[in-house]
């Protein structure tokens, strides 16, 4: 009986030690992600980055996204609601991170649309029709182009701008910045430079609310 108690006690100690070790590792990983973001803060926003909301808002959400990403599509209205619910206090900056096969050409179309002043309309159309052009985790640029025909983009300008040094540089810059910030999946969120470590809708809302509290008070 005593032996069983000793064995059980030893097992409990081992499990406890394992849990403590895992918590330490999680804290260390969280610290690494946050320090990486802080050291590379200049990589969060670029001049070409599309922006929505009040330019003077003191809370900034930066989102790295892939238009072929289903989770990005789900979170898009959530982020729009955040801006709507805190008018003038929160702005959104989006960055390209084409991880799905074929997505790089799609984000080039989006950036070409930005040059025509129709980025947000094109993004809305992209998400609304995602199931038609993003199939089995692969983006199909030709199908994408057909899906956004209602936006009214000039196709010749888009075709030319997609291959322009400006658009190619913008897309590559975003990819490089994502790497520098440790973003390897989409959507990747930062709120006032602080990365969203534990992914989820409630976690994002909490991060935004904390920033609102710091910047604007209760």
Regions found by a protein language model. Give the residues of each.
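C-terminal cap of thioredoxin/glutaredoxin-like
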Residues: 1-24, 146-218
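Ser/Thr/Pro/Gly-rich low-complexity linker/stalk segments immediately outside membranes or between
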Residues: 26-40
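Functionally engaged cysteine thiol sites
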Residues: 34-37, 112, 161
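A short beta-strand-turn-helix
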Residues: 41-59, 84
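Short secondary-structure boundary/capping elements
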Residues: 43-44, 74, 170
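A generic local structural motif
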Residues: 46-50, 78-80, 175-177
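Conserved strand-loop elements at the edges of beta-sheets that form or border functional pockets
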Residues: 54, 63, 198
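Structural alpha/beta surface segment adjacent to cysteine/selenocysteine redox centers
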Residues: 57, 62-68, 73-149, 154, ...
């Amino acid at each position: 009986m005593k032996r069983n108690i000793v064995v059980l006690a030893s097992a409990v100690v081992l499990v406890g030690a394992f849990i403590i070790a895992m918590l330490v590792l999680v804290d260390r990983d969280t610290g690494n992600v946050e320090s990486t973001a802080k050291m590379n803060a200049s990589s969060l926003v670029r001049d070409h980055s599309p922006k929505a909301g009040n330019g003077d808002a003191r809370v900034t959400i930066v989102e790295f996204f892939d238009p072929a990403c289903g989770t990005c599509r789900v979170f898009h209205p959530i982020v729009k609601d955040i801006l709507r619910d805190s008018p003038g206090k929160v702005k959104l900056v989006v960055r390209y991170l084409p991880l799905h096969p074929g997505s790089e050409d799609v984000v080039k179309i989006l950036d070409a649309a930005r040059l025509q002043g129709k980025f947000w309309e094109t993004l809305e159309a992209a998400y609304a029709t995602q199931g038609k052009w993003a199939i089995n985790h692969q983006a199909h640029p030709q199908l994408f182009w057909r899906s956004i025909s209602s936006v009214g983009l000039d196709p010749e300008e888009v075709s030319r701008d997609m291959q322009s040094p400006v658009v190619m540089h913008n897309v590559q810059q975003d990819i490089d910045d994502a790497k520098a910030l440790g973003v390897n999946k989409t959507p990747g969120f930062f709120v006032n430079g602080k990365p969203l470590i534990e992914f989820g809708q409630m976690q994002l809302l909490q991060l935004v609310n904390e920033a609102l509290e710091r910047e604007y008070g209760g």
